[in-house]
């Protein structure tokens, strides 16, 4: 099944490090080798372009490829659950989430930036995702390729009158 077994795979790396290209290569192989298969690209942050899709060789026919644009954690989770549980044709799915770090809980969408969950937010969402999806994906023979960014530079405005330990700057390896 595309060189990898049904499971959840996480690829982490720097921006422009080839994670999306790698995921698309696996998706192409999955489409070519698994009968009744479909690749679902969940675009929450990634820079997926028509050129990138063309270079990857992914089959973009409607019964083999779908792009879902959302960065709301709950809507992505619901889409995936619906596809794998209400699946009368027994289609095998290769999900690409690009990227997990761009996911936002619905409750944070209505909050101010200062009130939103910050510390290790991406790690908490990934953990919740794994708890809810790992067993269902693996036992029904689906694959999820989660892409994560490594943002190792955390910068703080030295002129701001706040405690530098309480930053809301992006970055870090939480």
Each language-model region and where it sits:
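Structural motif
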Residues: 9, 38-40, 93-95, 143-145
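Catalytic P-loop NTPase motifs of RecA-like helicase/translocase cores
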Residues: 48, 103-104, 153-154
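A short alpha->loop->secondary-structure connector
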Residues: 33-34, 56-65, 111-119, 161-171
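The Walker A/P-loop phosphate-binding site
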Residues: 1-62, 80-85
């Amino acid at each position: 099944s595309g060189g990898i077994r049904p499971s959840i795979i996480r690829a982490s790396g720097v921006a422009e490090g080839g994670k999306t290209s790698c995921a698309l290569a696996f998706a192409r192989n999955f489409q070519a080798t698994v009968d009744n298969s479909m690749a679902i690209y969940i675009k929450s942050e990634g820079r997926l372009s028509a050129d990138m899709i063309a270079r990857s060789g992914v089959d973009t026919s409607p019964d083999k490829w779908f792009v879902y644009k959302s960065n709301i954690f709950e809507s992505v989770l619901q889409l995936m659950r619906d596809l794998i549980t209400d699946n009368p044709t027994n289609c095998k799915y290769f999900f690409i989430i690009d990227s997990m770090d761009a996911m936002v809980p619905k409750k944070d969408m209505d909050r101010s930036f200062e009130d939103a969950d910050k510390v290790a937010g991406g790690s908490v969402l990934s953990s919740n995702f794994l708890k809810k999806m790992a067993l269902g994906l693996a036992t029904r023979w689906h694959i999820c390729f989660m892409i994560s960014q490594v943002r190792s530079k955390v910068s703080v405005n030295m002129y701001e009158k706040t405690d530098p330990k309480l930053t809301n700057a992006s970055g870090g390896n939480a």
